[in-house]
Design a protein with these regions (language model features):
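Conserved Rossmann-fold NAD(P)-dependent oxidoreductase catalytic core, especially the SDR/UDP-sugar
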Residues: 91-129, 136-137, 142-143
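N-terminal Rossmann NAD(P)H-binding glycine-rich loop of SDR-like oxidoreductase domains
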Residues: 5-25
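NAD(P)H-binding glycine-rich loop region in Rossmannoid oxidoreductase-like domains
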Residues: 48-91, 95, 99-101, 113-118
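Flexible, glycine-rich beta-alpha linker
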Residues: 118-122, 145-161, 181-182
């Protein structure tokens, strides 16, 4: 029987590609996509749009019952105010779960991060808090997907920002100074294929899927890979000094990164390429 789905973050770089993959299947009769700020440009009669703000009280009475599945991509990934992470990623996720549960939904897919740990700064802590609270609901199926650093969408954050810097200016930062600096770059094509497949074959019970790229890279290893591909010059960057400069900049109103960015970079991750449940095929 085809499912009625509620999909948040469907206009994001990752969510939009997973949505397109899902639309190739006949398993979904309706996909209700949440509209908040970015317009959704999808031409398919099964796609409906609903206005929703996760930071405000809402219900889902505009969606017919039952809602068979919620896919929750929407999140705040970079914020100058740490509380904003919790308003969206934690409290907003709980609101969504409560509203969906009230409309008969018993299957939930939550896109989390391998930085969902207590020492990862406000972003990781907010995602971990959401995970823990989702586990308290009576779901038939709860799938939590903890992904590593996804690249290849042409975005302006994370690995994509380093790729853009190396391609355009032929320089790349070589981060060192902490044993916690480790990347497991996951290509967006691998992410989409694995996530769409996991959604289609969602098993009963609470399941946490650790999803990483095929290799673990240190800061220097990542820099040399970018240097080789784009003929870029690796520029050594000692992380403690960089963190000090960023903090000093924030004191005078210069916010070049989110305050928790360094903590997120060096925190202990929930998994690595060596121990993930699912591994991408495309090497960085």
């Amino acid at each position: 029987m085809a499912m009625r789905v509620l999909f948040t973050g469907a206009s994001s770089a990752l969510g939009s590609r997973v949505l397109q993959q899902m639309l190739e299947s006949e398993s979904y009769s309706e996909i209700w996509c949440v509209h908040h700020r970015t317009e959704l440009a999808v031409a398919d009669e099964r796609v409906r749009v609903i206005d929703l703000d996760l930071t405000s009280d809402f219900d889902l009475k505009d969606i017919p019952t039952p809602i068979d599945l919620v896919i929750h991509f929407a999140a705040r990934t970079h914020a100058p105010d740490p509380e904003e992470y919790f308003r969206v990623n934690h409290q907003g996720t709980v609101r969504l779960a409560q509203a969906a549960h009230a409309r008969g939904c018993r299957r939930f897919v939550y896109i989390s991060t391998r930085c969902a740990t207590a020492n990862a700064g406000a972003y990781g802590q907010s995602k971990l808090a959401a995970e823990e609270e989702l586990k308290t609901f009576a779901w038939q199926s709860l799938l939590i997907i903890r992904a590593s650093e996804v690249y290849g969408a042409g975005g302006s954050e994370g690995i994509d920002s380093l790729i853009s810097l190396a391609r355009r200016w032929h320089i790349t930062p070589m981060l060192f100074g902490s044993s916690g600096i480790e990347f497991a770059p996951l290509h967006i094509d691998d992410f989409v294929a694995i996530v769409a497949g996991a959604i289609a074959s969602q098993k009963e019970g609470p399941i946490i899927m650790e999803l990483c790229g095929p290799e673990d890279l240190s800061g220097p290893s990542l820099a040399w890979a970018l240097a080789k591909r784009f003929r870029a010059l690796p520029v050594p960057v000692w992380l403690p000094l960089l963190a000090l400069c960023l903090r000093a900049g924030r004191q005078v109103g210069l916010n070049l990164t989110a305050p928790d960015q360094t903590e997120r970079l060096i925190c202990a991750k929930t998994s690595s390429a060596r121990g993930a449940d699912a591994i991408g095929d495309i090497r960085f």
